[in-house]
Amino acid sequence: MAQDWHVGNAHEDGQQHRGWVIGHFLGDADGVRASRDVEVKWGVHPAGEGREEWVTDEKRTTLLLLVSGRFRIDLSVGSFVLENEGDYALWGPGIDHHWQAEKDTVVITVRWPSVSEA
């Protein structure tokens, strides 16, 4: 049922793809959510969860927007803590990163373009 509109719940829709609700990894049956232009993730992270290994050789631009909680993002250019609703970090291609949820956290991640990491 491919179509050019969709209404849903990001938490539910993202369960199949680790929180990602829009991106190239969705099939034609997902309609407008299948995109090679942008990826959107609803990220729910318990306190202490993180990515210890650095993400390197990134080819996309990334926006990380804090909905709730406290979230540390370590970039190759510095470390930042998102702690107030609406705080965000934005970085371009070539910036390495890793992260940790310092409290139970909800973030929205937007990356563009949507490309395979392989």
Indicate where each model-derived feature is located.
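A short, N-terminal "cap"/entry segment at the start of jelly-roll beta-barrel domains
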Residues: 1-47, 52-54
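Short, conserved beta-strand element in jelly-roll/cupin
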Residues: 56-73
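A short hydrophobic beta-strand segment most commonly corresponding to one strand
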Residues: 43, 88-90, 103-118
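Short acidic-glycine-tyrosine-enriched beta hairpin
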Residues: 77-94
